């Protein structure tokens, strides 16, 4: 018989063997800080609903604006691809919310188990790889001015964007291989989870690859790029580019740290039980990232928000270098007008 913790009722992606013979976790709450299972379920469902309701229309608007912009501004194409990755995740949320509402029962069969969970992992990998490419592009634009108008920039950006999706798909395969539809008896239900079949090496390998390629490696690269840009070229820095990078890591860092703890924690330990209890909320925070970018577009485009949402998105995508150049031209033009109006 399996002794389950609370979290498995709400998490559609957990490591099945970790839930075997876990220690009993106290259910009394002397400080009044514990959630009941019903409150926990409601919090998760509200979170999923909010992400869906904000993310789908928001990302659709951003996708439309960035698609129009990308036809004559290469930089906007990065946000078009990022938005598509976020939309991919957002549209899957109603399907992922159903097992939460049914307290862990998976109604979509083995194919749905494999497909829906793989979509979220693909979205994560594609997003972080695209953000890595965006950071490199911004770095080259700042320190190699000739890069902006170079023909090989267009080719390079397109190659990196396509490679981000292909590599993301490739990195999704290992976890998909171990995904199973599992039968439980107490209570009777089907659960979508990862079953490594007791293979510690497989679990460690997949966790390590996900941590290095989906988190640590991109984090080091992007922190280096944006740190140098912020210190040495603050006036030409693109705040939206930095904001989407920071937002990604705020949302996904707890998830990756949690996966490492789950892989490293001793089996049947109290630490593992506690971590698994918190897992659904950490997963929800990671998925919430898919609704974050539209909010950032509205924030950075707030000066034009009174005109229209489209105008706000256009303003958020503006290039600080172009804006600086425009200000310079206006200043020069104004100076000429003042000189011409001076009495001789």
From Swiss-Prot:
Record GO cellular component, one term: basal plasma membrane
Residue ranges that the UniProt entry lists as topological domain Extracellular: 1-44, 102-120, 179-208, 267-280
Modified residues (Phosphoserine): 325
Intervals, Cytoplasmic compartment: 68-78, 144-155, 232-243, 301-344
Functional note: Receptor for the chemotactic and inflammatory C3a, C4a and C5a anaphylatoxin peptides and also for their dearginated forms ASP/C3adesArg, C4adesArg and C5adesArg respectively. Couples weakly to G(i)-mediated signaling pathways.
Family: Belongs to the G-protein coupled receptor 1 family.
Descriptive protein name: C5a anaphylatoxin chemotactic receptor 2
Phylogenetic placement of the source organism: Eukaryota, Metazoa, Chordata, Craniata, Vertebrata
């Amino acid at each position: 018989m399996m002794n389950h913790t609370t979290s498995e009722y709400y998490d559609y992606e957990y490591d099945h063997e970790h839930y075997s013979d876990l220690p009993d976790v106290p259910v009394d709450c002397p400080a009044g800080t514990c959630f009941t299972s019903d409150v926990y379920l409601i919090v998760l469902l509200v979170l999923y609903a909010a992400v869906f309701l904000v993310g789908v229309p928001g990302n659709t608007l951003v996708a439309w604006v960035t698609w129009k912009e990308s036809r004559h501004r290469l930089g906007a194409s990065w946000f078009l691809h990022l938005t598509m990755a976020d939309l991919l995740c957002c549209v899957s949320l109603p399907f992922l919310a159903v097992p939460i509402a049914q307290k862990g029962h998976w109604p979509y069969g083995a194919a749905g188990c494999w497909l829906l969970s793989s979509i979220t992992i693909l979205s994560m990998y594609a997003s972080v790889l695209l953000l890595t490419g965006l950071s490199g592009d911004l770095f080259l634009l700042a320190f190699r001015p000739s890069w902006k108008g170079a023909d090989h920039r267009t080719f390079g950006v397109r190659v990196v964007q396509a490679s981000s999706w292909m590599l993301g798909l490739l990195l999704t395969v290992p976890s998909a291989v171990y995904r199973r539809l599992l039968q439980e008896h107490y209570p009777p239900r089907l659960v979508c989870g990862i079953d490594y079949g007791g293979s510690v090496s497989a679990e460690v390998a997949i966790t390590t690859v996900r941590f290095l390629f989906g988190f640590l490696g991109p984090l080091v690269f992007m922190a280096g790029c944006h740190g140098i840009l912020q210190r040495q070229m603050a006036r030409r820095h693109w705040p939206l580019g930095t904001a989407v990078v920071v937002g990604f890591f705020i949302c996904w860092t707890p998830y990756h740290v949690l996966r490492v703890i789950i892989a490293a924690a001793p089996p049947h330990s109290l630490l593992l039980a506690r971590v698994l209890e918190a897992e659904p909320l950490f997963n929800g925070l990671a998925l919430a990232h898919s609704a974050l970018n539209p909010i950032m577009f509205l924030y950075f485009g707030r000066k034009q928000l009174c005109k229209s949402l489209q105008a706000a998105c256009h303003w958020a995508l503006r290039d600080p270098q172009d804006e600086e150049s425009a200000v310079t031209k206006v200043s020069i033009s104004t100076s000429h007008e003042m000189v011409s109006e001076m009495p001789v």
